[in-house]
Amino acid sequence: MADGVDHIDIYADVGEEFNQEAEYGGHDQIDLYDDVISPSANNGDAPEDRDYMDTLPPTVGDDVGKGAAPNVVYTYTGKRIALYIGNLTWWTTDEDLTEAVHSLGVNDILEIKFFENRANGQSKGFALVGVGSEASSKKLMDLLPKRELHGQNPVVTPCNKQFLSQFEMQSRKTTQSGQMSGEGKAGPPGGSSRAAFPQGGRGRGRFPGAVPGGDRFPGPAGPGGPPPPFPAGQTPPRPPLGPPGPPGPPGPPPPGQVLPPPLAGPPNRGDRPPPPVLFPGQPFGQPPLGPLPPGPPPPVPGYGPPPGPPPPQQGPPPPPGPFPPRPPGPLGPPLTLAPPPHLPGPPPGAPPPAPHVNPAFFPPPTNSGMPTSDSRGPPPTDPYGRPPPYDRGDYGPPGREMDTARTPLSEAEFEEIMNRNRAISSSAISRAVSDASAGDYGSAIETLVTAISLIKQSKVSADDRCKVLISSLQDCLHGIESKSYGSGSRRERSRERDHSRSREKSRRHKSRSRDRHDDYYRERSRERERHRDRDRDRDRERDREREYRHR
């Protein structure tokens, strides 16, 4: 704003507001636009989660100007005194607090605002209450701590930064202790006396249209607990998945619903009605179900028996479902829960799973008479504990047979391999006979053994023709071995030269096979050239004949 411009009337008490800020340091957390953005008391709080107050009121005895009017009553310009009321349960609502204050004879309540968790919108257990006179504030500080609100005595303090930080620390400790102890949120105990409040009236619940006394952030009650009562003469709507079972400890949430962080709260007492239940598929804005008409409804599979008095411990088993009901009470023997129908359980007769094993991944059930196979033991087909066969690739005949069985050969490939085996057999026999006649029995024996192993490793070794070749090579090998046993000196010499000659023979064999292939291709190429030459000669003769005829 430029200098020299006169201030309008709205800023007449700016200095007074600055004095209030100097006296009270809690204005650090004030957002000046929250009063404009946030809805009025008749519409409930703003839907977004806030970790602090919308507005912090001035201290005791200060007058408020037009710009700092309270959120609830915009026309009020008189004295306004703010107090903190803490040590409340997280399900305490504005209506509960209003009832307690009115019961003390204090009727000048200007504002009630609860502090909420930013993460889930749940109450932190303390609220700001604004009243219009010092007498009312003193009466609240003296008498309200003596009243019991949901099993706890409220704590009333002046509105300043010190007590605000104390309440914040207490709410954090409560949240952490509730999470460490693993206590689930079983839902607040609903009150039938508060069910008569009109929806959309002055009381501001955490959700618009919620039944007073209900959950500020309705979490699913466990499998136990019948639904709360309905107004007389009203037909109860049929829940999507059936009514809940008998009262019991809190259980897992229904599918598709998020459970807010658990907070430590007083357990359900026997003199209070059970908590309201939010069924799956029911939006948060709708009120919880009221009392059902007299008479138990038919049981619906999936959520246990119909509501009513708790069944005896020795009663009939409940119908099967994804969440079997627990016994009615925190004490009692734990029930063995069967796995859901869509998950395989451990096989019958098998030992129970170890604590670290996920039962969802057990093998499917097998016949109880057959031994169950373990991952560390032999397969059930081998009673002697031998390892299962494996594919050895190119290292032996069994692997080759398996390979042949897996990939059938074409006729051309089969004939090519058979021709190669025949060539190996004939050349090995001829060379072995020549080496044996020269007295080199070791080289002859090695040649025959090598040929036999090559034929056995081929892809067609299981064929009868290959077996005939192998038997002929083996007969030749036996004959040469019998001859070699009669000549000891020759055998000694052959042993000395065995190693060197074997290398030479293998090289010679490779070179000969290559030469044969080269000769074969050369011969083919020569034949092609001859055919081409003949075709050219024929074409030339035809051309000459044509030329001769044209003349």
Swiss-Prot record:
Residues 358-551 are annotated as: (Microbial infection) Binds to HIV-1 capsid protein p24 (CA). Transmembrane segments: none annotated. One of its GO terms (molecular function) is RNA binding. Residues 1-213 are annotated as: Necessary for interaction with NXF1. Changing F126A: Increases affinity for UGUA RNA by 40%. Changing R206A: Loss of methylation in presence of PRMT5/WDR77 or PRMT1. Residues 220-265, 285-366, 377-388 have a biased composition (Pro residues). Changing Y84A: Reduces affinity for UGUA RNA by 40%. Residues 405-551 are annotated as: Necessary for RNA-binding. Residues 510-551 are annotated as: Sufficient for nuclear targeting. A motif (GAR) lies at residues 202-206. Its main location: nucleus. Residues 169-180 have a biased composition (Polar residues). Residues 404-551 are annotated as: Sufficient for nuclear speckle localization. Contains an Arg/Ser-rich domain composed of arginine-serine dipeptide repeats within the C-terminal region that is necessary and sufficient for activating mRNA 3'-processing and alternative polyadenylation (APA). This is Cleavage and polyadenylation specificity factor subunit 6. The gene is CPSF6.
